[in-house]
């Protein structure tokens, strides 16, 4: 009987499967910021399926060979144990398990039986490993189906009614929806870097969009489309639903509801503007229904400069640039826990409220405390939302909006 080749094949199969499972068992490396393409996912899935089918076919062939050996050994054992003496002659018995001729001694039979048991054990192990591999393939298939479902969900369309927009203009209703599909779409389509780029691509409807400035992960912004381009809304005050007396980290990362009151975040604004020429627009509203708008050419520094804001005289307003500070002066951002204002004797953010480019505390503060009516006491009013050169230092405004727009390529 020729068991050695079969045993060798089984051992080789076992080693190959063990190697495969060893590679599979390694911890997955940290997720990188790039997703594999759909073609690469298909190639990987096809390769895994082919490998699983090959393993199964090899095991089935080996099992069939071992089954034949077991049948012959069983027949030989039955003939040797026949009490009536009707067993075949010793040579015929040996030929049952050794068709090539030669004597099969009891030691040979015991050796064959030991080999058969060992190979049966290995076969069982192989079947367990193949079953494990099959489960892994099924999980991979589920992941592929999930990816396909997400791709279908992110087809080029608007949320409600517009079906002909490019996929990278995908709109989402809530900031929380950035997790999951929002990151996937950035791997499938290049997202716009700001609202102005959306405008240049033909978008004319204001609303919530995903953008991805250079060097930044994707995030949700509120875009306002006007006749002179797309503006990114970075702040809105309207009803006092959000507390703006926040620490430095909150002003850095952003807070609030992008469909209501919110602060986008200094780091996000810095990524949007980058080193490009930019302008900042401020929209103000008082309690009598009057409104005013201003625009400033600006440059916003990074965190190493405390997000310093440098501005020059306004380009579209009857109000003076002294609302912020003397023209050309660079003002760092301040909060109650990080004081960067120009006053050496006090912390403007603690004395007033909220975080802002305070300067000397007296020019403006659009992140101050929100009042639903004008307080009678002056000490209270100074903590409110104010713009000194419009409605005065002690008039708390009803609503404000701050927007930014790049004016030149980087």
UniProtKB/Swiss-Prot annotation:
Signal peptide: 1-23
Compartments where located: Secreted; Secreted, Extracellular space, Extracellular matrix
Residue stretches making up the Fibrinogen C-terminal domain: 186-408
Function: Mediates inactivation of the lipoprotein lipase LPL, and thereby plays a role in the regulation of triglyceride clearance from the blood serum and in lipid metabolism. May also play a role in regulating glucose homeostasis and insulin sensitivity. Inhibits proliferation, migration, and tubule formation of endothelial cells and reduces vascular leakage.
Record-annotated site: Cleavage: 171-172
Region described as Disordered: 81-106
GO biological process, one term: endothelial cell apoptotic process
UniProt keywords, alphabetically: Angiogenesis, Coiled coil, Disulfide bond, Extracellular matrix, Glycoprotein, Lipid metabolism, Secreted, Signal
Lineage: superkingdom: Eukaryota
Protein name: Angiopoietin-related protein 4
PTM info: N-glycosylated. Cleaved into a smaller N-terminal chain and a larger chain that contains the fibrinogen C-terminal domain; both cleaved and uncleaved forms are detected in the extracellular space. The cleaved form is not present within the cell.
Positions annotated with a glycan in the UniProt record: 184
